[in-house]
Design a protein with these regions (language model features):
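Cleavable N-terminal export/targeting peptides
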Residues: 1-23
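Short glycine/proline- and aromatic-enriched beta-strand/turn motifs that initiate or cap beta-hairpins
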Residues: 17-65, 69-72, 87, 158-162
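Residues on the lipid-exposed face of transmembrane beta-strands in outer-membrane beta-barrel proteins
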Residues: 28, 38-44, 74-78, 92-94, ...
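Sequence/structural signature of outer-membrane beta-barrel proteins
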Residues: 31-35, 56-64, 95-103, 137-144
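Outer-membrane beta-barrel channels and translocator barrels
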Residues: 43-49, 81-85, 124-128
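Mid-chain, structured segments of secreted extracytoplasmic proteins
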Residues: 61-103
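Predominantly the C-terminal beta-signal and adjacent terminal strand-loop region
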Residues: 124-163
Length: 163
């Protein structure tokens, strides 16, 4: 077991040493829930365009509902073709939901965790600047949230900076 762990650690460390740049990508979330997010990682790892960690915070406020969702994901970016201007990002992770419903002075609260998925199209405009547009989906257990169908879907727009 120690040999397998050592080999895995060695391969991860040697891969990250060969990375060529930092991947940083702020984003805006658009939909019934709105908010922001950020990706941070390294480029050119294990034959991929980038490997990164992603965090986002979205919220919904109304007279009756006050809801927030925080997501924590790991993602990869893969560029296509000879001249890699076009690519795709895929992310998977966890989502944390906190919601409050106020009706006739009574307050009801719900908190849960669920699955978070994301995907985006990437256009690499220059070696240092890329643009992306995608969709995020957070899926929670039935009746654990105030969200219809216990699922949130958001569109996102972001810029990718590599340095």
């Amino acid at each position: 077991m120690k040999i397998k762990t050592s080999l895995l650690l060695l391969s991860v460390l040697s891969t990250s040493v060969s990375a060529s740049a930092i991947h940083l990508s702020p984003e805006l979330k658009i939909g019934s829930y709105h908010g922001f997010g950020v990706q941070a990682g390294i480029t050119d790892v294990a034959s991929l365009g980038a490997v990164y960690l992603s965090y986002s915070h979205i919220w919904y406020d109304s007279d009756r509902y006050d809801e927030t969702v925080d997501t924590y994901r790991v993602g990869i970016q893969n560029m296509f073709g000879r001249n890699p201007n076009h690519g795709f990002q895929a992310e998977i992770g966890v989502a944390s939901y906190d919601g409050t419903k106020t009706r006739s002075g009574e307050v009801e609260e719900k908190t849960t965790h669920g699955l978070s998925l994301g995907g985006a199209y990437v256009y690499q405009a220059t070696p240092m600047l890329g643009l992306r547009a995608g969709v995020d989906m957070n899926i929670f257990d039935h009746n654990k949230t105030f969200v219809p169908y216990d699922t949130t879907v958001n569109f996102n727009l972001g810029a990718i900076i590599s340095f």
